[in-house]
Amino acid sequence: MADPIPPITLPPATSPEQEGLWLQATLHQWLDNEFLPEAVNGDIAARASQVFVRQRMEGENDLGSLVIAILTEMQGFDFSQSFYGEFAIANAVSDLLLDSLGIDRCCGAS
């Protein structure tokens, strides 16, 4: 059996608002590129970014906890006009953050 991947901790937030702007723009671009550009993609990216920023401002640095918070709060979002759902959004945020840190999404190695 493979060894479990250790938890991934983000560096402490020095500018959560700036991180949020980056995440919002990057997630919106990812959503538009993954399937079709849709008007709702901007709303999805804004909401996920809002949750992320709030969590970071509260001191959350654990990637798994951030993803669960986004997943949980995105369950209340109306995805009826989108190809996506809360799981796809939470996973995309995780992938984008891992990419930004230079961490291999497959195996957790830098």
PLM ranges: what are they?
Residues M1-E38:
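Short terminal alpha-helical segments
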Residues A13-P16, E60-G64, S82-E86:
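Amphipathic alpha-helical protein-protein interaction segments
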Residues I8, P12, E58-N61, F77:
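Protein-protein interaction and targeting regions used for scaffolding, dimerization, and localization
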Residues E73-S110:
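Amphipathic alpha-helical binding modules
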Residues I5-P7, H28, S49, R54, ...:
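Intrinsically disordered, low-complexity regions
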Residues E19, I44-A48, I70, A92-L97:
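Amphipathic alpha-helical segments in structured regions that serve as interaction surfaces
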Residues A25-I70:
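Amphipathic alpha-helical interaction modules
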